[in-house]
């Protein structure tokens, strides 16, 4: 049924393209294609979810969503501006930036996502952790049909406070019959087109130059700090970049280097970031044109685009709010305070405010208020320590992590034009907030905000560098200077991407895959399994079934209090009893190598004496408790 999935996605992307054409009828394909992908993915997240809340996340809801979106596409095609090719002088520059990164991205997705090697699934360094969680969420939503979903990594009653629409965009294709790899990758391909293309287009619009946009593009996606210096001391240290586990010039915690490459360490492994930026970057483009270029009619399209954003990536939604606040202040200060100017802002705020409030009230907003270690004060991101001190000097921390872009921010700000400074004001608001307030248990995750501040800084620095070197009359010297700056600013990321391309880790064995397939075919969709808390548990990650206690590396950082489930897991393995099994609603109990390595006194004989052996393969055995 993969063909059906491709057709389904095409319907949403076609509708997105039609919306992009209607919003900007004079734009070339270099705008319409990535902007259309952004709209299409946004529709894919929002429309099926609206029907699924009422009908369940089942085939009828998905087909109704497709019918509505198809009808929208037909209406827009018939009543919109007739499609004509318009001059697009910047297309070559955009694709010259996007296509090389697209090739690298496709290769990494191929080797990192359920890559079958000799019967086992392999992955790369960056996906060894997070992908196991995303696969489980995607599968669980598809098999249970519940939206909002249950939280499948814990027994008992727990709110699903994670932005789950970044998962439903793949769950859709599982319901339609696609295999797990296809379902996982399909929406990511469209999202990457949006992210890459709509990072370049705002840069072009803000800076007024294709050359500056290209430099900003590479500074953001391939920029890095001075971490590579730590590996120049010996050939052995340099070679360790390509063999160690997270010993790269952009992720070397021994020297407090933590400003990772956004492609290999954010977009590929972290779906919320990818799908958040897939909507946020087109939104920044529309915000600039809506506010700074006075195209007030665009507020409708901007609102439509960002409707699902809080449940795709909450950090991106917050970043957009702060940037819009800066642009709103600009409107009040620099433009006439007339109804024609202010009313679009009011309508935009009203529509998004109401929809976002409904989306977040019982999900991410509630979780941020009553979850464990969520909303709190903390100084200087990951450089700050719990006692209020800093690991490194504040400025040195960012100099060595971000490098040339950070060093040039102040001169770039004063070099910028007034409207560019106002836009960067939104970035400064993001920086200030992220440096003092943490929104989740993992301080590190505030980088989802900091990278948007950094993106706006890359725009200003690219403009500064291009203007500086344009004053150098001798073209060879101009080229040499730019090349030197690019080398200093990007060498660390080049090494990091090279390391990621070479990385190869075993993730799930053939026996794990076979067990997950059996569970998928034979276990009840709402069954609860007792397993170890390994982050690679195939019962959850591959079969999508709920487990009593998942890995602390997941549940803790989702703000969950899992003490009761963790203690119950150990008790049910070491000192089991039927009352506790019934209390936690356990339907199946798994014994495998993870159980015996992590729980030394696991008592399989107690279960073998009382319950039938439901499944056995290699070193894995499952006992059926109920029925």
Regions found by a protein language model. Name each.
Residues 473-627:
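Extracytoplasmic
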Residues 104-109, 222, 226, 312-316, ...:
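Transmembrane alpha-helical segments
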Residues 1-91:
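Membrane-embedded, hydrophobic transmembrane alpha-helices
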Residues 282-290, 323-335, 400-421, 467:
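Hydrophobic, aromatic-rich transmembrane alpha-helices
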Residues 189-192, 273, 318-321, 443-470:
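Hydrophobic/aromatic-rich transmembrane helices and adjacent perimembrane loops
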Residues 264-267, 286, 299-314:
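Membrane-interface alpha helices of multi-pass inner-membrane proteins
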Residues 102-279, 315, 505-506, 533:
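Active-site lumenal/periplasmic loops and adjacent helix-entry segments of GT-C-fold
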Residues 297-308, 323, 345-350, 416-438, ...:
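Transmembrane alpha-helix segments characteristic
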């Amino acid at each position: 049924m993969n063909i059906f999935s491709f057709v389904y996605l095409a319907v949403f992307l076609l509708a997105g393209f039609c919306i992009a054409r209607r919003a900007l009828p004079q734009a070339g394909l270099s705008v319409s294609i990535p902007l259309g992908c952004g709209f299409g993915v946004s529709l894919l997240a929002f429309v099926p979810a609206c029907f699924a809340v009422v009908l369940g996340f089942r085939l009828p809801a998905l087909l109704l969503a497709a019918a509505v979106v198809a009808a929208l596409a037909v209406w827009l095609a018939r009543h919109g501006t007739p499609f004509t090719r318009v001059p697009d002088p910047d297309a070559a520059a955009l694709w010259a930036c996007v296509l090389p990164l697209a090739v690298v991205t496709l290769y990494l997705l191929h080797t990192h996502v359920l890559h079958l090697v000799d019967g086992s699934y392999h992955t790369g360094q960056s996906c060894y952790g997070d992908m196991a969680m995303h696969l489980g969420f995607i599968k669980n939503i598809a098999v249970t049909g519940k939206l909002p979903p249950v939280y499948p990594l814990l027994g008992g009653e727990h709110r699903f406070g994670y932005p789950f629409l970044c998962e439903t965009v793949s769950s859709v294709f599982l319901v339609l019959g696609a295999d797990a790899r296809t379902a996982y990758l399909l929406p990511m391909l469209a999202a990457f087109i949006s992210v890459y293309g709509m990072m370049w287009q705002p840069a072009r619009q803000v800076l007024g130059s294709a050359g500056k946009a290209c430099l900003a593009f590479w500074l953001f996606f391939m920029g890095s700090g001075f971490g590579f210096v730590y590996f120049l001391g010996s050939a052995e240290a340099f070679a360790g970049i390509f063999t160690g586990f997270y010993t790269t010039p952009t992720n070397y915690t021994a020297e407090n280097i933590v400003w990772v490459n956004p492609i290999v360490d954010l977009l590929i492994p972290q779906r919320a970031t990818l799908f958040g930026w897939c909507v946020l970057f087109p939104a920044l483009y529309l915000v600039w044109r809506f506010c700074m270029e006075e195209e007030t009619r665009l507020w409708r399209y901007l609102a439509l685009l960002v409707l699902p954003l809080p449940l795709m990536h909450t950090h991106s939604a917050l970043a957009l709010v702060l940037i819009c606040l800066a642009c709103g202040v600009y409107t009040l200060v620099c433009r006439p305070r007339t109804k024609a100017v202010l009313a679009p802002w009011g309508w935009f705020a009203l529509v998004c405010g109401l929809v976002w409030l409904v989306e977040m009230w019982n999900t991410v907003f509630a979780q941020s208020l009553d979850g464990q270690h969520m909303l709190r004060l903390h100084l200087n991101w990951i450089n700050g320590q719990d006692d209020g001190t800093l690991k490194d000097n504040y400025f040195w921390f960012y100099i060595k992590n971000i490098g040339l872009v950070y060093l040039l921010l102040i001169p770039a700000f004063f070099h910028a034009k007034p409207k560019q400074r106002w836009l960067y004001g939104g970035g400064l608001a993001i920086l200030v907030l992220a440096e003092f307030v943490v929104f989740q248990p993992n301080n590190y995750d505030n980088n989802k905000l900091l990278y948007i501040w950094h993106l706006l800084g890359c725009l200003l620095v690219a403009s500064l560098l291009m203007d500086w070197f344009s004053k150098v009359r001798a073209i060879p010297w101009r080229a040499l200077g730019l090349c030197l700056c690019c080398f200093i600013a990007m060498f660390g990321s080049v090494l990091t991407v090279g390391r990621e391309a070479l990385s190869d880790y075993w993730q799930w064995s053939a026996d794990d895959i076979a067990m997950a397939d059996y569970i998928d075919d034979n276990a009840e969709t709402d069954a609860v399994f007792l397993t170890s808390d390994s982050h690679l548990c195939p019962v959850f990650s591959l079969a999508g079934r709920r487990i009593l206690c998942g890995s602390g590396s997941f549940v803790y950082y989702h703000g969950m209090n899992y003490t009761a489930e963790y203690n119950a897991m150990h008790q049910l393995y070491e000192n089991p009893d039927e009352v506790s099994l019934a209390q936690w609603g356990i339907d199946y109990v798994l014994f495998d190598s993870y159980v015996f390595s992590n729980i030394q006194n696991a008592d399989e004989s107690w279960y073998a004496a009382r319950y039938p052996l439901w499944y056995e393969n290699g070193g894995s055995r499952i006992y059926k408790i109920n029925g």
